Amino acid sequence: MLASPLVSSSASPKITLGCVAAAALLAASISGCGGGEQQDANEPSGNYEVAISKVSFPRRQGLGETSKLVITVQNTGQSEIPDITMTVNGLNYRSTEPGVADPLRPVWVINAGPINGTTAYVNTWALGPLAAGDERSFIWSLSATQPGTRTLEYRAGAGLGGKARAVAADGGIPAGTLVVNVTRRPQDSTVDPATGQVVQKGE
């Protein structure tokens, strides 16, 4: 007569713990899904018209030379852009040397990026909202570290969350490329006596 209560009491906690564990797992799963949705909850959805109005970067550079990359964008639409962004590919290359911990190697060292523009993405910068008709410039200080013919690809965006999309006037993506020749020898330079500015020969 004593055996039945013992079996009953030992089985009951097992069922209860299993139910609790399953419920906890389900709750965690639901909570995790909700957290992901909230990351870009404040970013509006839609297309925002953007024009790349100016790009400045020396097409010929010497190894070790420091140059300024300037990309200016304009909001050519009627609505404020939530967060104007710029993605630049080609600042690094992937090394094929075996056994290296990090295969990415710099083609240009970034001495300074756009002020207050750092994001969680290594090749994307953001400069905040941009009102209709306004312009904003992304400016980098870059030093060439690898010789050869190099290509930079740049693309404007309207937000980091993926809901706001930048489009050109023709409906395409506001983007472009720059082809730069980096020589092994530093560029010769002179000082313009009229302006006092340093001028690189060959530009």
Language-model-derived ranges and their functions:
Residues L2-V20:
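Bacterial N-terminal signal peptides that target proteins for export
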Residues S29-G32:
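C-terminal motif of bacterial Sec signal peptides marking the signal peptidase cleavage site
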Residues G36-E65, V179-G202:
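Low-complexity, acidic Ser/Thr/Pro/Gly-rich terminal tails and inter-domain linkers that flank the onset
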Residues G62-P82:
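Short beta-strand elements of extracellular/lumenal beta-sandwich folds
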Residues I71, S143, P147-G176:
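Serine/threonine-enriched low-complexity regions used as flexible
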Residues S79-D83, T96, T149:
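Short acidic/proline- and small/hydrophobic-mixed sequence motifs that coincide with surface turns
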Residues T85-T124, A131, F138:
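A surface/secretory-pathway sequence property marking extracellular, secreted
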Residues G128-T149:
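Low-complexity, intrinsically disordered segments enriched in Ser/Thr together with acidic residues
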